[in-house]
From Swiss-Prot:
CDD domains: MEMO_like
Pfam annotation, one family: Memo
Transmembrane feature ranges: none
Protein name: MEMO1 family protein Tpet_0837
HAMAP family listed in its UniProt record: MEMO1
InterPro entries recorded: MEMO1_fam (IPR002737)
UniProt similarity note: Belongs to the MEMO1 family.
Length: 277
């Protein structure tokens, strides 16, 4: 089954040339972005990498996302990319894995790695084959043009989470650990924005707690802060999955808010790029 783009022309340009230029602008942005284009390693990725990436419209979160894609490119090309995104639509299964076929963007199509999807489905108590949760969801889709820009051909496994409980995060981490046994060069993207629609000062404070949990690689601390500090982070389940995977290192690459782009600091959304390796 081929998934057509749901948010081309909304979150990013629908024309190929305009999309390529928009992604270039995100990388070359020197105020919020890294100010340089990626130079992918000619080698293959040697070990698993986790990547926390934002998923708003490219003009807002693209420069922050570019920091992560720039860094990931230095590690080498992955054999498969698992993209875990939160379910914003309420459609589909609690943990929906797109099992086969391909996803289309204005830059072309990327295949779903059927074998990798099969391993995850067979290793998880919660994951189910599901197309409906993905049809209108943007959080996974917006990562793919960046992947195509950096790596060209790459295969993916999209996972959409309506259930982002600690039990699901731990279960998915175990399933992905089994995936690593067959696909050691996997890149796992946790797609999330951080605190939503509060003022800049409040969002910077709340987002700092999320970054602390990531630096400490502590999923329990992440969930504690979400409740204690009332943080409206949308994709915490994917991040908690990464934090359950026993990565040795975690590095914050860039944090900014929508207010840093628009100048409106009264209601902002927080964006983060971080890697775990």
């Amino acid at each position: 089954m081929k998934r057509k783009p749901a948010v081309a022309g909304l979150f990013y340009p629908s024309r190929r040339d305009e999309l390529v230029e928009q992604i270039r602008i995100c990388f070359l942005d020197k105020r919020i972005g890294p100010g340089e284009l990626p130079d992918p390693s000619e080698t293959k990725l040697q070990s698993p990498i986790g990547f926390v990436s934002p998923h708003a419209g490219y003009i807002y979160s693209g420069p922050v996302a570019a920091w992560g894609f720039l860094e990931v490119a230095k590690f080498g090309e992955p054999s498969v990319v698992v993209i875990i995104g939160p379910n914003h639509t309420g459609l589909g299964r609690p943990v929906g894995v797109w099992p086969e076929g391909e996803w289309e963007t204005p830059l072309g199509t990327v295949p779903v790695n059927q074998r990798a999807a099969e391993i995850i489905l067979n290793s998880s108590r919660y994951a189910e084959e599901d197309f409906m949760s993905h049809i209108r969801e943007h959080s996974i889709e917006v990562q793919i043009p960046f992947l195509q820009f950096v790596f060209g051909d790459v295969s993916i496994v999209p996972i959409c989470l309506m259930d982002q409980s600690p039990a699901v995060a731990e279960d998915l981490a175990n399933a992905l650990t089994k995936l690593v046994a067959e696909f050691p060069s996997v890149l796992i993207i946790a797609s999330t924005d951080l605190n939503h629609y509060e003022d800049q000062r409040t969002t910077l404070r709340k987002d700092s707690y999320i970054m602390e949990a990531i630096r400490n690689k502590d999923p329990r601390l992440l969930y504690e802060y979400l409740v204690k500090e009332d943080i409206s982070m949308c994709g915490y389940g994917g991040v908690a999955t990464l934090l359950n995977m026993n990565f040795k290192n975690a590095r914050i690459l860039k944090h900014a808010t929508s207010g840093d782009v628009s100048g409106d600091k009264l209601e902002v959304v927080g964006y983060l790029s971080a890697i775990l390796f």
